[in-house]
């Protein structure tokens, strides 16, 4: 079953994105490059606890 996760910018700490993931299939923490509106550039966003 998919659970909701929050993606946080690693540079400024802004939490701009919500996503879903299946934690049984992918137990590791997700990290994606996304656009950060605060920094106004593409930065690495990681899954929060």
Swiss-Prot record:
It comes from Lactobacillus gasseri (strain ATCC 33323 / DSM 20243 / BCRC 14619 / CIP 102991 / JCM 1131 / KCTC 3163 / NCIMB 11718 / NCTC 13722 / AM63). Belongs to the bacterial ribosomal protein bL33 family. This is Large ribosomal subunit protein bL33B. The keyword Ligase does not apply. PROSITE patterns: RIBOSOMAL_L33. HAMAP family: Ribosomal_bL33. GO terms for molecular function: structural constituent of ribosome. The lineage of its organism: Bacteria, Bacillati, Bacillota, Bacilli, Lactobacillales. GO terms for cellular component: cytoplasm; ribonucleoprotein complex; ribosome. Signal peptide: none annotated. The gene is rpmG2. GO terms for biological process: translation. SUPFAM superfamilies: Zn-binding ribosomal proteins (SSF57829). The keyword Ribosomal protein applies. InterPro entries: Ribosomal_bL33, Ribosomal_bL33_CS, Ribosomal_bL33_sf, Ribosomal_zn-bd.
């Amino acid at each position: 079953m998919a659970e909701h996760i929050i993606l946080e910018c690693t540079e400024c700490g802004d939490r701009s994105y919500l996503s879903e993931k299946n934690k049984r299939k992918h137990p590791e923490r997700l990290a994606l490059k996304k656009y950060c509106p605060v920094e106004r550039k593409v930065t690495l966003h990681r899954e929060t606890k």
